[in-house]
Amino acid sequence: MLLGVSALAESDTLVIYFSCTGTTKGVAERLASVTGADLYEIVPAVPYTAEDLNYNDRSTRATSEQDHPETRPEIGGEDVDLTGYSTIYIGYPIWWGEEPRILCTFVESHDFTDKTVIPFCTSGGSGIGRSGDDLAKLAGTGNWLKGARHSGSISENELSAWVEGLK
């Protein structure tokens, strides 16, 4: 179930994701399916265009945001209430070896107290690096587990095995 601020939780597990190209979205949807989790998309107030994501152009929006760690892009759409969730997966692409700055906006504006948080990322070649640790530090609350990088083509069976390995 895709959640907004007024939705009632149907599960004690939530998959939160940010995706510009659909790769992370696909993994998040499969993860929600195998865990029975609710699903929430972090939507930027100003959507990213293909030009914004051109990694070969140092003047693009995404490059500028990543070059300035203090940048906090605004989140649009409805917010999500984390009350009632005990396990939260947070998925995102890796941009220039790090989490996109909009993830910083999200974790700094939510309370993860008494939550187990599992970061996951998608990337064409980079690993998860320190992004999960960076987000945990910014959040300041929650029990953040070691995250993992998944390919966009990861199967539900592979995701199930990963989830089981977290226990």
Q: How would you describe each model-predicted region?
A:
Residues 4-86, 90, 97-99, 108, ...:
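N-terminal beta1-alpha1-beta2 submodule of the flavodoxin-like/Rossmannoid cofactor-binding fold
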Residues 105-108, 135-137:
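Glycine-rich, phosphate-binding/catalytic loops in enzymes
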Residues 25, 29, 100, 128-133, ...:
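Short, surface-exposed alpha-helical segments at coil->helix boundaries
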Residues 41, 119, 146-149:
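Structural signal for conserved beta-strand scaffold positions within catalytic alpha/beta enzyme cores
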Residues 113-116, 141:
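A short helix->loop->beta-strand "cap" motif at the edges of active sites that frequently abuts
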Residues 121-126:
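Short beta-alpha junction loops
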Residues 97-101, 142-143:
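Substrate-binding/catalytic groove segments of enzymes
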